[in-house]
Amino acid sequence: MTKFPRWLAMLVGLLFPLSALTQQQGLTIDIVGGNTAATPIAVLPMPYHDSAGAPATDVSGVVAADLNRSGQFRTLPLGQITERPTHGSEIRFPTWQALKQDYIVVGRVLDARQGTYRVEYELFDVRNGKRMLGLAMTARASAMRDVAHQMADAIYEKITGLRGAFFTRIAYVTASGSHGAMRYALMVADSDGYNPQTIVRSAEPLLSPDWSSDGKKLAYVSFEKGGSSIYIQDIATGSRELVSSFRGINAAPSFAPDGHRIALSLSRSGNPEIYVMDLVSKQLIQLTNSFGIDTEPVWSSDGKFIYFTSDRGGRPQIYKVASVGGAATRVTFQGNYNASASVSYDDKKIVVAQGSGNVYRIAMMDQSSGSTVWNTLSTGSLDESPSFAPNASMVLYAAREGGRGVLYAVSADARVRQRLVSVDSDVREPAWGPYRSVH
């Protein structure tokens, strides 16, 4: 389970950078757990009002799926929708009160000419009939899923007060083929697994993708220099830069919030230690110097601290050090194995891969209340590589099921889990990207 031997065992690989080549097969989502206490909301079908060709995307279906998988909402099944208003003025609120719905979303899709569509939608509080949102968005047919994700974000934020994270992307690595003929790919997709793009193909494993804060670049580990090397690649253009190929291990890159630095693990002086590299000058600052293995750095939201995994105390635990250097302090104390930290946007929550015996699960350390509370989020036996959504409402992680790799997204309260599966490959090494800008 531990990632330390993985770095030491990697062989020389060959990478073939691609410019965001679309891959046909995406991820499919199965919801394997639900939250009966979630807020009930009716997202009504949004019909197309024009004689021209309708967009292929079911906008209301995407919105409903987003809200469902958040764990905060429970949408009314289509079979129970007895009335189908498309404007707020057509809503008969007693109908939805009888169906025990707290909120209702209505809307319609219009032809905006020149190959674009306009989606108009409204959100209402069923209890008092008050309109909470009334918005419209225009986009081309190819961008209608983006529109739906942004609609779900707006609805989520209006009701919960927390920014939605549906209009985001995830990165992950796929592995296919048989021993001796394995093929790997670094992928980027929408947060629900749709619209996959191949960023890099490889004949050897790819590791540790990490997003820049603007979502335009990925850092990752490759092996084309006779050992591990770290590259940074532009997602849109496919251009990439070799930033670290020192003798020994070059591992676990992590972008600073300012986008101008990365933290990484290097063994150039012996044991793997944590360093910070300025991406312009390539100057290095060594932050740790211990007899153990220090790896998997991740930044605090303000860039002042770096959390990392170290076995300096005998077993892997999470430690913290100032990003300009200084003494490291231990952060995790529950359990004998805590690794692969991901830190929430407010630095109050940390998710880790937590081991007990031969069982490894995703656990969250929550200090929001001022005291430390632990909660186990996953149910597998070989769960790893947790990654917070940018609003910390969900966690993406890798698991093994039936001898193959899959991804799971779990709500932060552990009440809702979805499995993301590739039909023809293993999936591993997930990383949830930052918020995307809305144009």
Curated annotation (Swiss-Prot):
One of its GO terms (cellular component) is periplasmic space. It comes from the Bacteria. Keywords: Cell cycle, Cell division, Periplasm, Signal. Gene3D superfamilies: TolB, C-terminal domain (2.120.10.30), TolB, N-terminal domain (3.40.50.10070). InterPro entries: 6-blade_b-propeller_TolB-like (IPR011042), PD40 (IPR011659), Tol-Pal_TolB (IPR014167), TolB_N (IPR007195). It holds the Pfam family PD40. GO terms for biological process: cell division; protein import. The keyword Membrane does not apply. Residues 1-22 form the signal peptide. Its main location: periplasm. It is found in: Periplasm. The Tol-Pal system is composed of five core proteins: the inner membrane proteins TolA, TolQ and TolR, the periplasmic protein TolB and the outer membrane protein Pal. They form a network linking the inner and outer membranes and the peptidoglycan layer. Belongs to the TolB family. Part of the Tol-Pal system, which plays a role in outer membrane invagination during cell division and is important for maintaining outer membrane integrity. NCBIfam families: propeller_TolB. This is Tol-Pal system protein TolB. It comes from Xylella fastidiosa (strain Temecula1 / ATCC 700964). The gene is tolB.
